[in-house]
Amino acid sequence: SNFKGYYGYPATVCTSVNEEIVHGIPGQRVLQDGDLLSCDCGAYVEADGVQWHGDAAFTAVVGNYASETDKYLDRTTERALWAAIAALAEAGASGWKDARINLIGDAVESVVFDAAQETGHELGIVEEYVGHGIGTKMHMAPDVLNYSVSSKGVKLQPGMVLAIEPMITAGRASNETLDDEWTVVTRDGSRAAHWEHTVALTPKGVWVLTARDGGVSGLEPFGFTPTPLSA
């Protein structure tokens, strides 16, 4: 794991339950049927004295019961992640011409906005915690925002590797950190979901390094096919 000891983090994974958004510390808590659990984990391999890092997260409902709100929150967050990856795939298919990093935030925000409009329920995009570049270190430039901004950000190009990780709440996105100095929770007690993949930009598209199929199944609904690193 590349998590344990990172800035003093005490565990090998982050486990965030219900109103916990991110950086939850595993402990003795007994999970209950219907809990919403987000797991964020990372690993690295070392070659020739150089570390190469990966980072991923997913959300799942514990047990056999899930409220419709929780299921919709989870699906929306995962779809926002894949919509962002699809936006990268589209840019890559066009040779990355004039492609800028904030197309990711545009894609995430569009999915969340449409979902909120469809259901009439409030959904929040957490802005304080964002994705990042990744490679020889777990966190590298550039920041990868999950929301739209006026600036378009850095130019995208083949060879970049990005950790994309939308964190969405079923209420307001306002949050605070608990006394353990790690666990981030929603202020209004609303539940949160967190999905993440590490994505390599190839000359003609993307390859999802943390998906077993490279992103085939996730991109298929958007009409794109990932391109291997050698393509």
Where are these regions (language model features)?
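Active-site neighborhoods and metal-handling regions in enzymes and metal-associated proteins
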Residues: S1-A231
